[in-house]
């Protein structure tokens, strides 16, 4: 009982003291800060103003890089080195024990059959070269009832084309038969009912062959597709399918005009590339090696990056240096 009374007295005293303290007059303000917005105390080095470019959320592939075709070499779906794949859970396990989401190994993001009479699959045997690990096999079984067949490239949420603009197409093609078969390539609307460009017709060969063509769009669309179609039954392989609009400053394998014009207006004094976590990766083969980003795009090393999607290395070391030169900015490679 005595303890309770003592506790109550102490509690009341603390309340009284707190109340007296809160009633004290505030300390008067004796200091004033003056800001002179017109004056300059110390100039900032202009070389400290620049930009960072990183492959994250498709900022480069599907963003700054002008390539319109997603998964152009069909190598998305190849698990990184030393990362076991769990097909049931659709995850890969990194060497550090982290589980990361991963697509089915036969996935072909950015591609689909043109019709139900067509079967497509990533092929690991009919390869363009030793550095390119997969191609796309397309098998068409046409009839009077089911019409034409083929394969569609949808790009990154559709191909944005402008009437009157030109688009540079290149691809590698191989036929399954020694007898040549005709294949028609065109830009079409999203459901393949309307042709939005001229039609490029080629004959297949029994060996890999590279083809080039310049399309001129006859309509404007934000959801166009690129089609490879045939009215006859046939099997063929595709690889390194590339479609470019006019690039900034006309650079081959270059960057998008609209984004680069916006960057140029910032007048950066330096460009830091190719990223932060992107250059770290999480196992061998999940980070860029500058020597592997040079030369023919058909031989550049594709890899699955730390942000969970495939990287073409299309904007490689040379393209970054060219970008810096065109901007008049210093390159900072990390």
Task: Annotate each language-model stretch with its function.
Residues 23-315, 325-332:
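Extracellular and organelle-lumenal recognition/adhesion modules and their flexible linkers in secreted
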Residues 320:
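Aromatic/hydrophobic pocket-lining residues that form π-stacking "cages" and hydrophobic walls in ligand
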């Amino acid at each position: 009982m005595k303890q309770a009374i003592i506790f109550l007295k102490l509690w009341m005293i603390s309340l009284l003291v707190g109340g007296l303290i809160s009633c004290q007059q505030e300390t008067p303000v004796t200091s004033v800060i003056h800001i002179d917005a017109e004056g300059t105390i110390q100039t900032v080095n202009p070389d400290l103003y620049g930009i960072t470019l990183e492959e994250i959320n498709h900022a480069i592939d599907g963003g700054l890089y002008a390539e319109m075709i997603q998964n152009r070499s069909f190598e998305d779906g190849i698990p990184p080195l030393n990362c076991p794949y769990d097909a049931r859970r659709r995850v890969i396990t990194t060497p550090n024990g982290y589980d990361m989401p991963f697509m089915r190994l036969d996935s072909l993001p950015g591609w689909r059959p043109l019709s139900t009479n067509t079967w497509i699959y990533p092929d690991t045997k009919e390869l363009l070269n030793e550095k390119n690990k997969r191609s796309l096999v397309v098998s068409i079984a046409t009839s009077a009832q089911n019409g034409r067949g083929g394969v569609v490239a949808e790009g990154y949420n559709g191909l944005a084309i402008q009437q009157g603009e030109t688009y540079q197409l290149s691809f590698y093609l191989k036929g399954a038969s020694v007898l040549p078969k005709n294949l028609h390539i065109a830009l079409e609307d999203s459901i393949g009912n309307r042709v939005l460009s001229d039609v490029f017709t080629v004959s297949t060969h029994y060996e890999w062959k590279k083809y080039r063509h310049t399309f001129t769009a006859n309509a404007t669309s934000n959801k166009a597709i690129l089609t490879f179609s045939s009215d006859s039954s046939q099997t063929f392989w595709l690889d390194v399918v590339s479609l470019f609009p006019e690039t900034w400053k006309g650079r081959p394998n270059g960057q998008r005009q609209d984004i680069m014009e916006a960057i140029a207006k910032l007048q950066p004094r330096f460009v830091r590339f190719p990223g932060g976590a992107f250059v770290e990766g999480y196992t061998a083969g999940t980070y860029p090696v500058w020597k592997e980003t040079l030369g023919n795009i058909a031989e550049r090393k594709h890899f699955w990056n730390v942000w969970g999607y495939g990287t073409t290395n299309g904007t490689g070391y040379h393209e970054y240096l060219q970008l810096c030169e065109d901007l008049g900015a210093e390159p900072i490679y990390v």
